[in-house]
Amino acid sequence: MQTVFSFLLAALLHEGGHYAAWLFGGGKKNNGGASFRFGYAGAELRVPPSGSYRAALAVQLAGPAANLLTALVTLFFPGDFPRLLREQSLLLGGLQMLPIRGLDGGGALEATAALLWGERAAYRLPAVTSWLCLTALWLLSCCLLLLGSGNLSFFVLSFWLLCRQVRR
């Protein structure tokens, strides 16, 4: 039960980081667009576009930053729950920073590419990095399964993310 609760708390803190950055960047709580939900893929916060690539970049990076901050704070607390929360936070924040469309890293890459090279690069670069990362993750999960040292959940996650990319 502690594992489930620690993951839910890590996800809430992650999404809270996004929300705080959105509010700090000028977003309004009641502007008719911010919504939070738990879905089959985890927690999701939807906020209206800010109109600024810098603000979008800050919002994208704020979730993983909240996970990193959570992990650092839990270093000072003994026990199983802080350790679980630290591990879950680092896992969630690290996974979200992969440069894959639909994850925070993909959104951050898109905003950065738009700032540096324009709209065309903002569309193309995340598409390429998504395919490269997802293919590498899926191949790694297949190899680990075949060698007997992998786990099925990593294979399912990488396959699910790859299928999501195919649908885009």
Residue ranges and their predicted role:
Residues 1, 73-79, 139-147:
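Hydrophobic alpha-helical transmembrane segments
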Residues 2-56, 87-88, 98:
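Small-residue-rich helix-interface/hinge motifs
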Residues 3-11, 83-94, 147-163:
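Hydrophobic core segments of alpha-helical transmembrane domains in multi-pass membrane proteins
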Residues 9, 14, 63, 96, ...:
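Divalent metal-coordination and catalytic microenvironments
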Residues 17-26, 70, 74, 111-113:
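Active-site-flanking alpha-helical
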Residues 34-36, 97-116:
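Juxtamembrane/interfacial segments flanking transmembrane helices
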Residues 62-73, 129-139:
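Core segments of transmembrane alpha-helices
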Residues 112-168:
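C-terminal transmembrane module of polytopic alpha-helical membrane proteins
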